[in-house]
Amino acid sequence: MKVSLFITCLSDVFFPQVGKSVVEIMNQCGVELDFPEGQTCCGQPAYNSGYQEDAKLAAKQMIKAFEHSEYIVTPSGSCASMVHHYYKEMFKGDSEWYEKAVHLADRTYELTDFLVNILGKNDWKSKLVEKAVFHQSCHMSRALGIKEEPLKLLSQVEGLDIKELPYCQDCCGFGGTFAVKMSSISETMVDEKIKHIEATEANLLIGADMGCLMNIGGRLRRENKNIQVLHVAEVLAKGLNK
């Protein structure tokens, strides 16, 4: 099986260790992985800010970059959601690019979705002794409907004690440009999220979207909270039997 890695902007710039973890995971699964160098931003920031033409340019570049990929895997529910839902919306009325957008969406998977539903992984061999909570991101859980897959994989990590996060469905307040445009509301939302995390007495927060992890993790650091933040890919790569 051949898989192309869609790394995303945040992983490329702020979370390179997540990309490395995805590579380790795919190697463990015996997957042949490549990295199309023509890939760029999925266009979500431009799209959410009303810059439709700029978003279309980014989408077209992505479609071209992954034109020949069999499967496309990304460690981001948010970016996968952009490809799945909004590319088709942008290209309505343009039959050529609409068909290409549909073809791209059909081959694009969020990481945990791919591991569970395509590769059928149910015996993950990694180890991490921690008390943790899992944050469900909005785009991943609501737009893509991916809720159980990451928890199923995390339940297979030896030593990992996953606690139930109160109000787990609540947004962390990031929302891409929302955190900039509505900063005071965003701050209140992330403060509420941190209170809920602390209530579990967990010392590790796990998530599957780096925007959420950047937002919550940044707040935790500014408030000197002793809670580690990791992407689900990093957790799955911990202590792998390589």
From Swiss-Prot:
A GO molecular-function annotation: oxidoreductase activity
InterPro entries attached to this UniProt entry: Cys_rich_dom, LutA
One annotated GO biological process: lactate metabolic process
Domain of life: Bacteria
A Pfam family annotated for this UniProt entry: CCG
Cellular compartments per GO CC: cytosol
Disulfide bridge partners, by residue number: none
Family: Belongs to the LutA/YkgE family.
Described function: Is involved in L-lactate degradation and allows cells to grow with lactate as the sole carbon source.
Protein name: Lactate utilization protein A 2
Organism of derivation: Bacillus cereus (strain AH820)
Highest classification ranks of the organism: Bacteria, Bacillati, Bacillota, Bacilli, Bacillales
Gene designation: lutA2
